[in-house]
Amino acid sequence: MPKGLVVFATRTGQTKRIAQLIAEGMRFEGYDIDVFNVTEIDNGGISLDDYNAVVLGSATYHGEMLQSMKKFLFLAEKSNLDGKAGGAFGAFGWSGEAPGRIFDTMTHIFKMNMVREPLRLKGADLGGGIKMAQDYGREIARKALA
């Protein structure tokens, strides 16, 4: 069974909810999924090399991703993610820059095989967000299996 990892950084719980929905979409495609709040992971806590797909998300706060996700990205750079399927997501109130910055890091620095674009939602339960997040998870899972 393929393995996927979803790691999120949240302030109000919306990004966590989106992470859970993305994981659900990946499970629909037959994936075994681990979901972690980035604060639960210590410096050497998990090996990203063990996963077929890696999905990272952060809320946007004052135009930036949360500091805990920035720190995690520096740690993730030490892993071999070249060519692995990936996606980036996040919740936002006003501007929503964090998912795009994570996506760019995963594309250009980690050299991952990313889905078409990051998923940006004001909230998981608003405007079709549940289906959008589940479909995003399905898309990532299919990309990893292609």
What is the meaning of each model-derived region?
Residues T12-K16:
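Glycine-rich NAD(P) Rossmann-fold beta1-alpha1 loop
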